[in-house]
Amino acid sequence: MTTKVYFDITIDDAPAGRITFNLFDDVVPKTAENFRALATGEKGFGYAGSSFHRVITDFMLQGGDFTRGDGTGGKSIYGEKFADENFQLKHDRVGLLSMANAGKNTNGSQFFITTVLTPWLDGKHVVFGEVADDDSMALVRKIEALGSSSGRTSAKVTIAESGAL
């Protein structure tokens, strides 16, 4: 694991802190590169300015739909969708970064951060990174607390800036 990526988060437009991620580019280089490039915005599109549109308490935070903002959009740097790279990494701890999808080989730009163990997602979603440190995980927990069982958030959670470190 080498690449580090960050999100500077706002909650209802107020700065809330930074989430830093370690990407597992040694195991899933293509998936990690997609996330890194979307974080830097170097292809002319990406995560900056988008929101966490779905936050389910005791499950996960989902974001990455920078085209529609509601979970129906987004795109990868490789085109609309790309194939599942592999399922070597398991959802075996909290704070993992994994690709959201609409079924087999439908990865785009949407991702989620786990807040509990999610073994039922193994073999269905590609794990490609992790929350890097305790301060970042504390912010993930703060965002999780704004979620609900339906996924609707009680405040607007935005990725104000993002990039690589």
Curated annotation (Swiss-Prot):
A single GO BP: protein folding
Catalytic activity: [protein]-peptidylproline (omega=180) = [protein]-peptidylproline (omega=0)
Protein name: Peptidyl-prolyl cis-trans isomerase A
Molecular function, one GO term: peptidyl-prolyl cis-trans isomerase activity
Entry keyword set: Cytoplasm, Isomerase, Rotamase
UniProt note on regulation of activity: Binds cyclosporin A (CsA). CsA mediates some of its effects via an inhibitory action on PPIase.
Pfam families cross-referenced by the UniProt entry: Pro_isomerase
EC number: 5.2.1.8
Gene Ontology CC annotations of this record: cytoplasm
CDD domains per record: cyclophilin_ABH_like
Family label: Belongs to the cyclophilin-type PPIase family.
Job of this protein: PPIases accelerate the folding of proteins. It catalyzes the cis-trans isomerization of proline imidic peptide bonds in oligopeptides.
PPIase cyclophilin-type domain location: 6-164
Subcellular location: Cytoplasm
Top-level taxon of origin: Bacteria
